[in-house]
């Protein structure tokens, strides 16, 4: 019985370790790292490495991705184009030309925009930023070229790197083993000739919010026209001990944020950008709130028409040290399959399972509100969504008008307790409630959102 119990525990642990990186709204989302060997050299090979973000609504923000691995033997990196290793390592055994990196476990980062053209290749040099595939599929890829030495020089003698890691930019990603796949076929610029990689292997990395952080990074609050109750984010929704100290006044927040940026610049200038001090200064600097979340999403049921209803979405940033560029918001609600119009946000449906269309991805309009500014008077973006009613399912009762799940930048937000949702008064039908309660609810909502 003891052996059987141990076996069951092992199976359960394995199941949980797989399930923890599974996102039911994006079941096939992953980041794939592809190595294409383009040519052999006297002591190794030249490979084109491509990082494809196949996650529908999770991006990699600045300071960008970091890819690492362990060489199987004593390989070195002679040179790179479009990226660089962060540490050269000990190359003292080489007497003449020194390799770009001699570490057995190199860590590679993207180059910054504006580097000389002879250091660039296609899809490089964006500071490691990768947009979500559902948001910008043509830009959701990065690439660099690496020349590997002291390695195999044929398909039979090459040993694949192992123990791949991916930071995006923080933890949360788990990478599988490198696997040889059919060689990539390329089409020439005139589209009249095909060429083929000499060898190709793939590495698949999946994200787990539970590995990335102990606490959520966002929370959700609710309000409605038919009830003057505003349901706030749950107390300590993002961990009250995780973000200490916090800032009580906007003036202090701005002052500390500027001080942090100057300290960070000085640390980088003196080569201490990766030190403990710099890491501490990069930590979130949050406004003091009861929920202590960097981001709050507010869903307000605003208006009720005969055939339509309208909801207002407001995203508020409480972090004085973070701008969210290219942000994404995902909401799950059964009426999102009948969206008629979205005001001041872009919108795409997220269809994960056949014909089920109950999930929508929202993101900002380019050069208008695609950047959620740091905490303060400009640290919010908002939009309204107009939806056509389905007479078979539509109701304001039992919290039906509020979303089931909300994600910000790919991370699931903490929802309020279901028993706290604004209820529909029994004494008045929805139309009457709309007229009686709108003014009171809107006044309270404005005060709440500005707090």
Swiss-Prot record:
Its topology with respect to the membrane?
Lipid-anchor; GPI-anchor
One Pfam family this sequence matches: COBRA
- GO BP, sorted A to Z: cellulose microfibril organization; plant-type cell wall cellulose biosynthetic process
Q: Which residues are glycosylated?
A: 30, 155, 163, 202, 227, 323, 338, 357
Indicate the residues removed as propeptide on maturation: 427-451
Signal sequence interval, chain numbering: 1-21
Where can this protein be found?
Answer: Cell membrane
Q: Please give the chief subcellular localization of this protein.
A: membrane
**GO annotation, cellular component aspect:** plasma membrane; side of membrane
Record keywords: Cell membrane, Glycoprotein, GPI-anchor, Lipoprotein, Membrane, Signal
Residues with lipidation of kind GPI-anchor amidated asparagine: 426
What this protein is reported to do is described as: Involved in determining the orientation of cell expansion, probably by playing an important role in cellulose deposition. May act by recruiting cellulose synthesizing complexes to discrete positions on the cell surface.
Q: What protein family does this chain belong to?
A: Belongs to the COBRA family.
What is this protein identified as?
COBRA-like protein 6
Origin organism is: Oryza sativa subsp. japonica
Gene encoding the protein: BC1L7
